Curated annotation (Swiss-Prot):
Co-factor(s): heme
UniProt cross-references to Gene3D superfamilies, sorted A to Z: Cytochrome P450 (1.10.630.10)
Reactions mediated catalytically: an organic molecule + reduced [NADPH--hemoprotein reductase] + O2 = an alcohol + oxidized [NADPH--hemoprotein reductase] + H2O + H(+)
One example GO MF annotation: monooxygenase activity
One Pfam family per UniProt: p450
Full protein name: Cytochrome P450 2G1
Keyword Endoplasmic reticulum: yes
Location within or outside the cell: Endoplasmic reticulum membrane; Microsome membrane
GO BP terms in the entry: epoxygenase P450 pathway; sensory perception of smell; xenobiotic metabolic process
Binding site for heme: 439
Membrane topology: Peripheral membrane protein
Function: Cytochromes P450 are a group of heme-thiolate monooxygenases. This isozyme seems to be implicated in olfaction.
InterPro entries to which the protein is assigned, alphabetical: Cyt_P450, Cyt_P450_CS, Cyt_P450_E_grp-I, Cyt_P450_E_grp-I_CYP2A-like, Cyt_P450_sf, Cytochrome_P450_fam2
Gene: Cyp2g1
Length: 494
């Protein structure tokens, strides 16, 4: 290792020790930050926070320190929020204070504060407002998002019929169909399922989500100041994201070659219009970096989260076949066997709606939540959080809050049904987060989940290769995300 690199590591270690001692001394003396386990210089709370079970470690600490506590990721204090009340008070009641995006070191080199998901301040406000407007306009345009989902579901059904009931791994069937919906919005086109470039992209997105959820990623988030100087899997994730960025950039060039500002075809065209309007403003947030990275945010999130939820959902329905049977019955009564399912059917299908909500609640795709940051000195529940403090609102702890869900660890669709069998909202259902940073794609994802589940179950029954009692629904990996187990099933034509 070069002398300069070794010196940098030495200085980082020294600075880490100094910072953690200062922060802990200030906390213990002034009682400003919430309580928490005593950190060790440089290591922080590594002894209390297992990198292979971060979420479970936080729940264990909650029992000792309450619903608001502080842990140290190396030298960096991070405030953890557990349960519905604490998360709501922060993200909704004090929404502006907690509206910043916290550090995500595993992605920092790729994004550098650009793009919708990881930006802050005016940049974030401008990109969020623009993205919401474009998604809303496409939902009401000549070809609605609902029609795009219905069309794509039709292509998927054709592929499943071709298999003729043979066992398949649903992973890439689902990621390709779901991704094509967001592709039609951001790129203005869908990709053939056999397109090798498209298949490669789906593999990269899946691998990226897995890498972000591995124990090494949790370790990197704690000690990135040192680990970044060494070879390791963090470079693998960096390279995957860079390849995805290159693909987005190539799509931007394709759009530019045939760009007509009077006839925007997709999200990229709408962004290009703003870029040309602001081309004389060197400080405009409508620039190529924000275009590529915001498009990547939408492309990535619009592919992985919904497809993972569908994969978990099919597994749960095979484990609980009586639930699948009730959905089949409701589909027969409301939609029938021939008509294409529509979004407005959801209001007449409370049981199916409740099952989808329960799948999202129990599987909890992003249990840690995406980190927030307080944008000013903030008083919260009698504590003082200095400006710039990172905050983790544990979405999983809200979705499994025993005060709001009778059987938090069980699959129980009745969590979302009243005594008359009508759909019942639950304030603690925050699968899309809440407050000012709530997922911009919530409406799209809700439509996709309903239309895909009903379209598939209208035409097929699910058959497991093992008895229901032997189906293991435990996460394959649990970190930043909960990764579904790998399995095969048979789609049997009804």
């Amino acid at each position: 290792m070069a002398l300069g690199g070794a010196f940098s590591i030495f200085m980082t270690l020294c600075l880490s020790c100094l910072l953690i001692l200062i922060a802990w001394k200030r906390t213990s003396r002034g009682g400003k930050l919430p309580p928490g386990p005593t950190p060790i210089p440089f290591l922080g709370n590594l002894l209390q926070v297992r990198i292979d079970a971060t979420f479970q470690s936080f729940l264990k600490l909650q029992k000792k320190y309450g619903s608001v506590f502080t842990v140290y990721f190396g030298p960096r204090p991070v405030v953890i929020l557990c349960g519905h009340e604490a998360v709501k008070e922060a993200l909704v009641d004090q929404a502006d204070d907690f509206s910043g995006r916290g550090e995500m070191p595993t992605l920092e080199k790729n994004f550098q504060g650009y793009g919708l998901a990881l930006s802050n301040g005016e940049r974030w406000k401008i990109l969020r407002r623009f993205s919401l407007t474009v998604l809303r306009n496409f939902g009401m345009g000549k070809r609605s998002i609902e029609e795009r989902i219905q069309e794509e579901a039709g292509y998927l059904l054709e592929e499943l019929h071709k298999v003729k009931g043979a066992p398949i791994d649903p992973t890439f069937y689902l990621s390709r169909t779901v991704s094509n919906v967001i592709c039609s919005v951001v790129f203005g086109k869908r990709f053939d399922y056999e397109d090798q470039r498209f298949r490669s992209l789906m593999k990269m997105i899946n691998e990226s989500f897995v890498e972000m959820s591995m124990p090494w990623a949790q370790l990197y988030d704690m000690y990135w100041g040192v680990i970044q100087y060494f070879p390791g899997r963090h470079n693998r994730l960096y390279n995957l994201i860079e390849e995805l960025k290159d693909f987005i950039a190539s799509r931007v060039k394709i759009n530019e070659a045939s760009f007509d500002p009077s006839n925007p075809r997709d999200f990229i065209d709408c962004f290009l219009i703003k870029m040309y309007q602001d081309k004389s403003d060197p400080h405009s947030e409508f620039n190529l970096k924000n275009l590529v990275l915001t498009t990547l945010n939408l492309f990535f999130a619009g592919t992985e989260t919904v497809s993972s939820t569908l994969r978990y959902g099919f597994l749960l329905l095979m484990k609980y076949p009586e639930v699948e049977a009730k959905i089949h019955e409701e589909i027969n009564q409301v939609i029938g066997t021939h008509r294409t399912p529509r979004v407005d059917d959801r209001a007449k299908m409370p049981y199916t709606d409740a099952v989808i909500h329960e799948i999202q609640r129990l599987t909890d795709i992003v249990p840690l939540g995406v980190p927030h940051n307080v944008i000013r000195d903030t008083h919260f529940r009698g504590y003082f959080l200095p400006k710039g403090t990172d905050v983790y609102p544990l979405i999983g702890s809200v979705l499994k809050d025993p005060k709001y869900f009778r059987y938090p660890e069980a699959f129980y669709p009745q969590h979302f049904l009243d005594e008359q069998g009508r759909f019942k909202k639950n304030d603690a259902f925050v699968a899309f987060s809440s407050g000012k940073r709530i997922c911009v794609g919530e409406a799209l994802a809700r439509m996709e989940l309903f239309l895909y589940f009903t379209s598939i179950l209208q035409r097929f029954s699910l058959r497991s290769l093992v008895p229901p009692a032997d189906i293991d629904i435990a996460h394959k990996i649990s970190g930043f995300g909960n990764i579904p187990p790998t399995y095969e099933l048979c789609f049997m034509a009804r």
